[in-house]
């Protein structure tokens, strides 16, 4: 059939929007200096609004720091709005501030750690392509020069190390030159040891070694650590000394082993579970904890102390709520996925029914996930393939309406792996801090802000507070030192009951009196694990 010119014109007009919407969106992430990236978005015609995949408050706060370099487009809420058919360019300052997810422009001497999720766009205008530009690029286990295109399937979820000059090292790992040789050696030892142990114990796992990016950084306070476990495994060491003490060595071992343990899990596959954060972070903690004992990085007594501390703080920080009643913000703000997750894994797997080691049960759960199955989490860990088996630890902990404290008090006597014990002074100090926070919440319309110091605690003054109008540095409470005194907690309780107020002695010689209607509940007992029995149960065939 012969098609007339009129029909050709109409057909072309009808196809224009389709072709426009199938055009490619190109995102270039370029290292332009030690303290900035230039990120550009090449937008096709008719593409006037594209959604950022990192949305809501965290994503918007990240984009608020971007500096427009032209008038092509601007972030508005969760959208990149544009007239279309132009390339929007933004200067993105380097920052160590963690806002939401992986950092987008984390500085390191000579370059920057970058993660494309901070610049990822929806594909509503067509496929989105991501490219890194720098003299030296490490991405997906390879080194590139000048330019590297991220894989199409994972482009919006790809980390990279961008360097200002070509690198000559045969290793892809990056170690900040400010870190001591001893620190670098410890990172390598713990990384290699974790990989060796878990590769043997989890034979069904598909492990690929990530590139290490160990970066020194600074923040208020003392030495601390942070990181994440993407294909470039970022380890951030804050205020790190050249000569490590026992505390720094312990923190570093925990960080490195935890992050490498994550590489034997599947982060995205557990997102279908309501307890995804606990499954992922608690699982990483469990692997780290057991590996550290078996590799000799933790003595049995140290492992017991870590487990007992995590459980005690899980009970304290759930604040009389059930796990289901806690909001994601409450869980994340108190790190409850770690604190509650570690003992949940340890005790549930130690009390498992049927044959096989705890790690074999763990391995089988993740193998099922890799095959596309969604096994019941509690059933998979506690029962496996054991017939007529009913899990006895995880369901009450994670699904009951009773408080976490009540559920632990029910579960632990049944499995006979821990016994009550009086609180240590460290736990008494934790309870004093929680009592101070409760006073602030009641006085300040639900808000609180405190900073611990060697001499006491700083209470942040806020306009919404009835009594705490300015920052107050408290060095005593009811005549007792804030921390380190077994009598401080009971004195707070007695003052609240007798006078309905609690008195703070201030560093400047003044006094702060805060109303108190209901005293904080000071616990008189926590749990001590039977470490020998528990480890024997975890390792039994």
Language-model regions, residue ranges each:
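Zn2+-dependent metallopeptidase catalytic core
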Residues: 57, 61-66, 72-73, 82-97, ...
